[in-house]
């Protein structure tokens, strides 16, 4: 490996030229000669920075509208040359050793995501020379420092000046470079798969034969699902959508844990379904209470009072701005782990700062971005499915009992059905006036989920006569209907589809319960 004081030449070829002038100036201060391609070189020259254009060095012009400029033996030889053993051949062909390579690529991902761009426009933004330079530099990391992220530049220059640019630092930059080229190739490959009409005709384009996902670490977490498990949080590369836990900003509180993030995601995705002010409280992966009201304070109080025992230590999410009165009410009412809001008032911030342990996540504007693929890791495998983004479609629903639902019952049916989608199976949700009353979650039989909801109702002394029941899947037997009727349920919404549907409908008619079949199931495991 060459000594740091032998670093003499740098090649710069960047598509994103932000801060490149400052970078070049620091290289010049360190008496490092600059080589660059046309566009980058012109910017440096305009800023009075001495630079040698690649075409002047190679004595070969950029051709084909700039598509061929760095792929030349004098460039590749300068990067791949090993100074210990290639000096003679480099001298013979007048090849200048290149010690630092600074490159970023054509913005393929950005261009492909602009809908008005046709395939020719997109393909023209596939970088060829850039990835070649980076791969060659990373391969020869013992002799060449490769930088693909300008955030690494200052620390690199400092290491060069301090003569501490050791093999570990070089290897780390090379590793980052290969990650960069790998991700670039991946998004290009995925684009071609999506555009391949022949592939679309013969394969399932949503689920190709081979898939690759690229994530970057956002942060280390306090611990995993249990205290003895270490954990980190990774997010999709180049993701910019607001309104997700992945893009949320934590403005106060302790370091998030694995369970905090998992529960927060459920709470946020559930509350995003509602247009009126809504509150969702989640505990151990399940909504324990949900409420919709005319303002944020009432929605919180309704949700909290629905199940105050389960709300203790829960995750609270809202779909509207958190004000000071609601913030004060929350800290007066309960112990809370995380509060999630799209925005927060300055006075509410000051109130919550009195309880510094409360984690507060601000998501920005909420939007319906829960589309695409849903992933679940298993041992040595990955389950991939479409996200359960089923929207309410009244036209597909069937009103199967003698009595049709009243306006209130229909409204509550819609509300309970929206909540049931986020409750672990077997899921039973009782609700009235857009407030959950009792939730039975995660039982191995549907009747026991129903009994659990009944126990919650009875323990809290609630009168639920006239309330609605939602079931995430069909009832295999009439016992669930009878159990619900025993506490006063007057309307039921469920997918239908059981071989005993006729028996189930008769049971509902016997109890004068109205029943809706949605023809869609919402299992959650």
Curated annotation (Swiss-Prot):
A Pfam family of this chain: MGS
Assigned keywords, A-Z: Hydrolase, Multifunctional enzyme, Purine biosynthesis, Transferase
PROSITE patterns: MGS (PS51855)
MF-aspect GO terms: IMP cyclohydrolase activity; phosphoribosylaminoimidazolecarboxamide formyltransferase activity
Enzyme Commission identifier(s): 2.1.2.3, 3.5.4.10
InterPro entries reported in the protein's UniProt record: AICAR_Tfase_dup_dom_sf, Cytidine_deaminase-like, MGS-like_dom, MGS-like_dom_sf, PurH-like
Pathway participation: Purine metabolism; IMP biosynthesis via de novo pathway; 5-formamido-1-(5-phospho-D-ribosyl)imidazole-4-carboxamide from 5-amino-1-(5-phospho-D-ribosyl)imidazole-4-carboxamide (10-formyl THF route): step 1/1; Purine metabolism; IMP biosynthesis via de novo pathway; IMP from 5-formamido-1-(5-phospho-D-ribosyl)imidazole-4-carboxamide: step 1/1
Catalytic reaction list: (6R)-10-formyltetrahydrofolate + 5-amino-1-(5-phospho-beta-D-ribosyl)imidazole-4-carboxamide = 5-formamido-1-(5-phospho-D-ribosyl)imidazole-4-carboxamide + (6S)-5,6,7,8-tetrahydrofolate; IMP + H2O = 5-formamido-1-(5-phospho-D-ribosyl)imidazole-4-carboxamide
Top-level lineage group: Bacteria
Gene Ontology CC entries for this record: cytosol
SUPFAM superfamilies: Cytidine deaminase-like, Methylglyoxal synthase-like
Span of domain MGS-like: 1-148
GO-annotated biological processes: 'de novo' IMP biosynthetic process
Family: Belongs to the PurH family.
Domain notes: The IMP cyclohydrolase activity resides in the N-terminal region.
HAMAP family found in the cross-reference section: PurH
Name of the featured protein: Bifunctional purine biosynthesis protein PurH
Species this protein is from: Buchnera aphidicola subsp. Acyrthosiphon pisum (strain 5A)
């Amino acid at each position: 490996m060459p000594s740091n004081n032998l670093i003499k030449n740098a090649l710069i070829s960047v598509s994103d030229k932000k801060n490149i002038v400052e970078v070049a100036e620091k290289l010049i201060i360190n008496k490092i000669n600059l080589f660059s391609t046309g566009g980058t070189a012109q910017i440096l020259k305009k800023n009075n920075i001495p630079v040698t254009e690649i075409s002047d060095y190679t004595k070969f012009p950029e051709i084909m509208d700039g598509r061929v400029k760095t792929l030349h033996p004098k460039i590749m030889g300068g990067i791949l040359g090993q100074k210990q053993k290639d000096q003679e051949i480099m001298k013979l062909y007048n090849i200048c050793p290149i010690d630092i390579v600074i490159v970023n690529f054509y913005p393929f991902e950005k261009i492909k995501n602009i809908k008005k761009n046709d395939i020719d426009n997109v393909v023209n933004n596939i970088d060829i020379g850039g990835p070649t330079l980076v791969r060659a530099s990373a391969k020869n990391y013992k002799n060449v420092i490769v930088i693909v992220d300008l955030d690494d530049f200052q620390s690199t220059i400092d290491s060069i000046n301090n003569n501490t640019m050791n093999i570990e630092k070089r290897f780390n930059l090379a590793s980052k470079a290969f990650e960069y080229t790998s991700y670039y190739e991946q998004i290009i490959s995925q684009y071609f798969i999506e555009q391949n009409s022949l592939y679309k005709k013969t394969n399932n384009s949503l689920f190709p034969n081979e898939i690759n996902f690229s994530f970057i670490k956002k942060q280390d977490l306090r611990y995993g699902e249990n205290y003895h498990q270490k954990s980190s949080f990774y997010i999709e590369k180049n993701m910019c959508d607001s309104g997700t836990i992945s893009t949320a900003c934590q403005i106060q509180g302790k370091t998030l844990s694995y369970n905090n993030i998992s529960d927060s995601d459920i709470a946020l995705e559930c509350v995003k379904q509602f247009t009126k002010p809504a509150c969702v409280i989640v505990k151990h992966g399940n909504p324990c209470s949900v409420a919709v009201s005319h303002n944020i304070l009432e929605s919180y109080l309704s949700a909290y009072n629905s199940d105050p025992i389960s709300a203790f230590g829960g995750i609270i999410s809202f779909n509207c701005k958190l004000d000071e009165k609601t913030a004060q009410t929350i800290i007066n009412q309960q112990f809370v782990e995380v509060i999630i809001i799209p925005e927060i008032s300055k006075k509410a911030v000051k109130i919550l700062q009195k309880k510094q342990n409360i984690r507060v996540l601000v998501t920005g504007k909420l939007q319906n971005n829960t589309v695409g693929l849903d992933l679940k890791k298993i041992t040595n495998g990955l389950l991939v499915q479409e996200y359960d983004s089923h929207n309410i479609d009244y036209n597909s629903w069937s009103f199967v009992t003698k009595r049709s639902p009243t306006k209130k019952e229909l409204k509550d049916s819609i509300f309970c059905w929206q909540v049931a989608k986020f409750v672990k199976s077997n899921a039973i949700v009782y609700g009235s006036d857009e407030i959950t009353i009792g939730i039975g979650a995660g039982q191995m039989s549907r009747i026991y989920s129903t009994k659990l909801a009944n126990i919650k109702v009875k323990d809290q002394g609630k009168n639920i006569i006239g309330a609605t029941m939602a079931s995430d899947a069909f009832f295999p037997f009439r016992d669930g209907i009878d159990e619900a009727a025993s506490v006063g349920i007057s309307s039921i919404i469920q997918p239908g589809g059981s071989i005993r549907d006729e028996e189930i409908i008769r049971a509902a008619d016997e109890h004068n319960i109205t029943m809706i079949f949605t023809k869609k199931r919402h299992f959650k495991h």
